[in-house]
Amino acid sequence: MQAVWRYPVSSLRGERVDTLALASDGVRGDRDYLLVDLVSGEIAAPEKIARWRPALELDARVTSRGVLISSKDWAMMIDDAELDSALADQFGFRCAIRRAGSSLLTNVGEIKLSPRYLASPVHLLSLRSLSELSELLPEAIVDVRRFRPNIVVDTRADENDWVGRQIAMGACRGTVTEKTKRCGMTMIAQTNLCEDPEILRTIVQRRQRCFGVYADIDSEGVISVGDTISFDER
């Protein structure tokens, strides 16, 4: 494992960490929270809706006190009473960060805030794929942050060949279930990265829109940077 990442709030920038705790329902502390419009109940979708794109100018990371949300101008704990106001200034409308699975009273009634991503608990991406995309787009900044993986694997193997195979990751075991279909999040501008539609266009044209793989977790445990990843023999 070359790197591991966690994203405490869906649609916000995540954090590169040393270890991750994996469970059957995914990465502990990953995408536990959502960014939501307090009036309509709309969940943030920067890849589809332009008004949510400032989400990628915000960082979320786990501290000993809880989740810390920060911009270039401020930093607040997720339970800070002033956070909703700071987010409204950031986006230009009333919005907030709330826990996935909780309920929210909006102008259209009480709604349950469902998690955005249900495809698979863990997302893996190889350095090989990043390198190949960089070769196809020599003028682009092919940065891992555009693709939001949990695990970056240092391998020259083709990750598409992992689908359907059992995988051992440190103390954990899982099953690679499917290729990762890509959306507009890959091309959106974020801190130190410009908007670049060619990234998604090239993935669609050269990789059938897929970049990375998803895996289900069969046995829980903790993984760390530097752990070995292996697969069952076909």
Regions flagged by a language model, labelled:
Residues 1-234:
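Metal-cofactor-dependent catalytic cores
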